[in-house]
Amino acid sequence: MKKVLKWTAYVLGSLILFIMLASWYFSSKFNKEFEKVIDYTPDAIIIPTDSASVDRGRVLSVSCRSCHSVDLGGKVFFNDPSIGTLPASNLTRDKGSETEHYTDQDFVKAIRHGLNKSGNKLMIMPCKSYSHMSDADLGSLIAFLNTLPKVERTFDKRKFTFMSQVMAGAGLFGDMFHYDLIDHDNVKNIPSVIVGNTVEYGSYLAHVQGCNDCHKKDFKGGKSPDPVSPPVPDISQTGSVGKWTSEQFIQTFRTGSTPEGKVLNGEFMPFSGLAAHTDQEITAVYNYIKSLK
C-alpha cells in the first residue's frame, strides 16, 4: 500500500511540475512575442487629398468601427477578469493616444504590416486581411484618418492574467499577431482592382474584409478562430447562401437579417463593413462566392 501511495505521489508531483513548467513556458513565449521590437520600414505610398479618395477611405473605415468605435476614438475591446483588459487604439491622433505621433507611414506600418510605431506586434488587428488592400485604397483610408477630428479618449494599458498569457502562448486564442501571417516582401505596390460586380473585384473585397479569416478559404465555415465565439456558418454553394439570389444577399447586409429570418450578430459577424459598400460591390462578393467550387 505504501508503495502505491509513493508512486501515486510521484506521478502527481511530476504532473504538477510539468504543468507549472509548461505554464511558465507558454506565458514567457507570449510575453516575448508581445515585447519584441521589429525594425521594419514599409515602402511609402501616395496619400491623396481629393474628396473622392477621402470618401472612399470613409467607406473602407467602416470596418474599423467594430473595434475602434464609431468615431474611431477607440474603446475597450474586452475587459474580462479571467482574461484581462485590451483597448482598441484611438486612431484620431489625440494627445496622449497611441497614435498621437503617428505619421502616414506609421499607419501603413500598422494597417498593412501589423506593427505599431515602436515596432511591436499589434494584437488581434486583422492586418492579414488589410495586407491585400491596394496602395490606392490604403492611401484613401489613411487620407480619411487624416481628416478625423481628435477624440479625447484614453485607456488604461493592456494587461492580461497569467492564465490568459498561458492560453495565448499555447495558441488557444488563435493567431494573436497577424504580423507573423503576412509575406511582407510581397505586400507592396499592390495594384487597384477595377470596381465592378466582377468575380475579380469580389475576391479582392472579400479578402480585404477578411471573410475568409472566419469562413475559411473554401467559405464552408467551421470552428471559429476565437474560442469563445460560436461556429462559423457555411456560406459556400453548400450552405444557405448558395440558395440565395444576389438581391437577397444584398438585403442581408442592408438589413442585418437573412432570408431565413436569422438576425446577424454584429459582435461575431461584422457585416457593417461590407454593408457600407454599393450594391454593385456587394454583388461582386456574391458572384465571387458563387464562383467557388
Regions inferred by a protein language model and the residue ranges of each:
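Gly/Gly-Pro-rich "capping" loops immediately C-terminal to redox-active cysteine motifs
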Residues: D71-D104, K121-S134, F160-D175, K216-I250, ...
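Extended surface/linker regions that mediate inter-domain or inter-protein docking
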Residues: G13, L17, A22-W24, D137-V199, ...
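The canonical Cys-X-X-Cys-His
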Residues: G57, S61-V70, F107, L141, ...
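C-terminal capping alpha-helices of c-type cytochrome domains
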Residues: M20, D104-R112, S129-R153, S246-T258, ...
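Detector for the c-type heme attachment site
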Residues: C67-G73, R112-H113, N146, C214-K220, ...
